[in-house]
Regions:
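Thiol/selenol-based redox catalytic cores and closely related redox-interacting motifs
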Residues: 34-117
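Local sequence-structure signature of Cys/Sec-based thiol-disulfide redox active-site neighborhoods
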Residues: 1-23, 27-32
Length: 117
């Protein structure tokens, strides 16, 4: 079953959830703030996604900005970045949809349609 990791108050996550429900796609819901991803999960998702590690950061979030990560990330290793992401779910871009052989980060309807229909 798909894992849908989101923050319920996030409007993009709400749109993604509605899209999943409207398309009758079953998923397991997980609140990223209450149950943030572990280092092992993030490492696995990062490898499976084919994305750059920076795509996993919620660059518009208050925590990202308050920690000045825009300037700090370029000096960090991938392992350091993954460990940092694992400290607080609010640092992680959302929603995340995890399937057996794919990971989608953020909600782009066309991308989700291509993977799921």
């Amino acid at each position: 079953m798909l894992k849908f990791i989101c923050y319920p108050k996030c409007t993009t996550c709400q749109r993604a959830k509605k899209w999943l429900d409207d398309n009758k796609i079953e998923y397991e819901l997980r609140d990223i703030k209450l149950d943030n991803p572990t280092f092992a999960e993030l490492s696995s998702w990062y490898k499976l996604s084919g994305l750059t590690i920076k795509k996993f950061f919620n660059t518009s979030g208050l925590l990202y900005k308050s920690l000045d990560l825009k300037n700090k990330l370029p000096e960090m290793s991938e392992e350091e970045m993954l460990k940092l992401l694992a400290t607080d779910g609010m640092l992680v871009k959302r929603p995340i949809l995890v399937g057996d052989n794919f990971v989608l980060v953020g909600f782009k309807e066309s991308e989700w349609s291509e993977k799921l229909k």
